[in-house]
């Protein structure tokens, strides 16, 4: 028997849609009929939803100060509000949950005005602009890294963590293996489509500065943009360092589980996967990230001793070589960082998020949820 309808609203990018998809799987398993409200960009990411359960809502991004452009934007948002009201009158959802991005504004505003229970999920350690605009209206805020104490909305915040993919959960079963001074040292380097270019030049240059003894121990897996792939591979070949270089790895969680040390950007999904699997990391926040969310995510991991944060502007090849050499010769420190990272991982984030969603759909407050039996 179907418990009722829940609508998930998300911007049309993978970062917003993947956690929504993870929650959808969990809610469907519990007997809910789950629909997705999004924008036209979402078609390539919305495979987890049946075609008749994906609803394109008119929306627009608020950017710039041009009066005509702003007028068009607010007109699109108003039309999206009307779209959402029409949809909700038909579906009669028990809950509308937002996952960030401007396309969530019309559905969440419409739902709150129609007295439908609402909540948002924020992946990052600082709220994005859309979620920040909704925070005062919704019944609950689920956070990937947001704390439950301090801050304006702490009383309705629950730190659920960010849902991760099944391969990440499988990789988390592999314990961290510190290596001895004469053993191979597996280094994993990745940075996403925007961030990998810096690593493509900086890491090979740093490896070239390592003492021969340390360089001979390295086994590198590195993500590189397609236009950088050949140059990165050739650089390691000249140095005599075995390296697997590619624009994308389907088995990235397994490669992370095999690594002794990770160098990466600090997007919410990346940091969540590092903590669930439990690996020591040097995080280099993307310097142009909106709202400085990557810096905040990295700081959250560093605060518990799960790794270190270094600004890109501070990473000369010489500094990188120092960090690499220290990591390769301090296995006990890396093992402690791995344990610290794993201690804050949330492998059950999808379940926790679904528990909160069901509580809000049932009319409970966040305080009642916190005082009840928490998983």
Swiss-Prot record:
Reactions it catalyzes: di-trans,octa-cis-undecaprenyl diphospho-N-acetyl-alpha-D-muramoyl-L-alanyl-D-glutamyl-meso-2,6-diaminopimeloyl-D-alanyl-D-alanine + UDP-N-acetyl-alpha-D-glucosamine = di-trans,octa-cis-undecaprenyl diphospho-[N-acetyl-alpha-D-glucosaminyl-(1->4)]-N-acetyl-alpha-D-muramoyl-L-alanyl-D-glutamyl-meso-2,6-diaminopimeloyl-D-alanyl-D-alanine + UDP + H(+)
Which of the seven top EC classes does this enzyme belong to? transferase
The domain of life is Bacteria
Please state the pathway this protein functions in, per its UniProt record: Cell wall biogenesis; peptidoglycan biosynthesis
Keywords in alphabetical order:
Cell cycle, Cell division, Cell inner membrane, Cell membrane, Cell shape, Cell wall biogenesis/degradation, Glycosyltransferase, Membrane, Peptidoglycan synthesis, Transferase
- Compartments, record wording: Cell inner membrane
From its record, what is one biological process in GO terms?
cell division
Disulphide bonds annotated for this chain are: none
> Membrane topology per the record?
Peripheral membrane protein
This protein's GO cellular component annotations are:
plasma membrane
The record's listing under SUPFAM superfamilies reads: UDP-Glycosyltransferase/glycogen phosphorylase
Q: Which residues bind UDP-N-acetyl-alpha-D-glucosamine?
A: 13-15, 124, 165, 193, 294
Instruction: Report the EC code(s) recorded for this entry.
Output: 2.4.1.227
The GO terms describing molecular function are: UDP-N-acetyl-D-glucosamine:N-acetylmuramoyl-L-alanyl-D-glutamyl-meso-2,6-diaminopimelyl-D-alanyl-D-alanine-diphosphoundecaprenol 4-beta-N-acetylglucosaminlytransferase activity; undecaprenyldiphospho-muramoylpentapeptide beta-N-acetylglucosaminyltransferase activity
Cell membrane among the record's keywords? yes
Q: Which PANTHER family match?
A: GLYCOSYLTRANSFERASE, UDP-N-ACETYLGLUCOSAMINE--N-ACETYLMURAMYL-(PENTAPEPTIDE) PYROPHOSPHORYL-UNDECAPRENOL N-ACETYLGLUCOSAMINE TRANSFERASE 1
Q: What does this protein do?
A: Cell wall formation. Catalyzes the transfer of a GlcNAc subunit on undecaprenyl-pyrophosphoryl-MurNAc-pentapeptide (lipid intermediate I) to form undecaprenyl-pyrophosphoryl-MurNAc-(pentapeptide)GlcNAc (lipid intermediate II).
Annotated family? Belongs to the glycosyltransferase 28 family. MurG subfamily.
* Protein name, entry field: UDP-N-acetylglucosamine--N-acetylmuramyl-(pentapeptide) pyrophosphoryl-undecaprenol N-acetylglucosamine transferase
Q: Which organism is it from?
A: Brucella anthropi (strain ATCC 49188 / DSM 6882 / CCUG 24695 / JCM 21032 / LMG 3331 / NBRC 15819 / NCTC 12168 / Alc 37)
Q: Which gene encodes it?
A: murG
